Amino acid sequence: MRILGIETSCDETGVAIYDDEKGLLAHQLYSQVKLHADYGGVVPELASRDHVKKTIPLIKAALNDAGLTKDDIDGIAYTAGPGLVGALLVGSTIGRSIAYAWDVPAIPVHHMEGHLLAPMLEDEPPAFPFVALLVSGGHTMMVEVKGIGEYQILGESVDDAAGEAFDKTAKLMGLDYPGGPLLSKLAESGTKGRFKFPRPMTDRPGLDFSFSGLKTFAANTIRGNEDDLQTRADIAFAFQEAVVDTLAIKCRRALKQTGMKRLVMAGGVSANKYLRQELEVMMKKIGGEVYYPRTEFCTDNGAMIAYAGMQRLKNGETTDLAVQAKPRWPIDQLAPIK
């Protein structure tokens, strides 16, 4: 079975073709970073219009890369949510239309389920069950995963997501958009210990997160110190250290609570080198294992959507011709694979 996956939930247009026997056959990705850079953030209307321009050409390019035609495709998977409603409608409408024209089934895919299953694209995928840390610009949550569709949310952010806090703090420091990766790069030249940031919500039981206070703390620290490069690097280090420590503490609690020794990390922030390093050290200490996708599959992409859709189409799931777009869609509402 070969599935064409389409991802248009925010500011990346992703298309991929996944074969259940041969694996990933083609992967195309277009980022809108330059389009939104002048605005300092994603402009929904511009994002939607650009998806309209890019999705069909990327589908053609993916088919060409795989050496396939439309007759070789057995199903369509498209991101239906959560995300920006206009952007979701572009991918959903194109996916549904192609499925109708090509006479193949189509399946709406949950964006965060795609991220959660992205490590399954690797040569050594994690086995079920495991604890998943989904950490991106729009979401930060801890999920107990017993199987595909068997998700229990253990904790989530009550305000800003971790990636959002990175980007907002980077903006306070005068870094370009998108600021998160630039802040992490700046932190590499920072001095450990000069500044001490709090570890929010780690002094109480539970697995929820809160990162908006760190942004405020960073703003006050920036205002109260010299505006030189080393000081900014030291602040960046302290901020990143606080976020990573907070995530690690919550992961350790979740693993202890569930009795598991496998941790999966996915989403855009999972590409952060310092976060990977710290979680690897933590898991080694407790005799566990940590899994994450290759860097190119940490951000939004069509490959994870094609893979997730493949699992559900093989399970016999499909939907009617109505276009589905769900800006809000809790992951624990998904049906389990039988």
UniProtKB/Swiss-Prot annotation:
GO terms for cellular component: cytoplasm. Keywords: Acyltransferase, Cytoplasm, Iron, Metal-binding, Transferase, tRNA processing. Its main location: cytoplasm. The keyword Metal-binding applies. Substrate binds at L134, V135, S136, G137, G138, D167, G180, N272. It is found in: Cytoplasm. Fe cation binds at H111, H115, D300. The keyword Cell membrane does not apply. It comes from the Bacteria. GO terms for molecular function: iron ion binding; N(6)-L-threonylcarbamoyladenine synthase activity. Belongs to the KAE1 / TsaD family. This is tRNA N6-adenosine threonylcarbamoyltransferase. It comes from Aliivibrio fischeri (strain MJ11). The gene is tsaD.
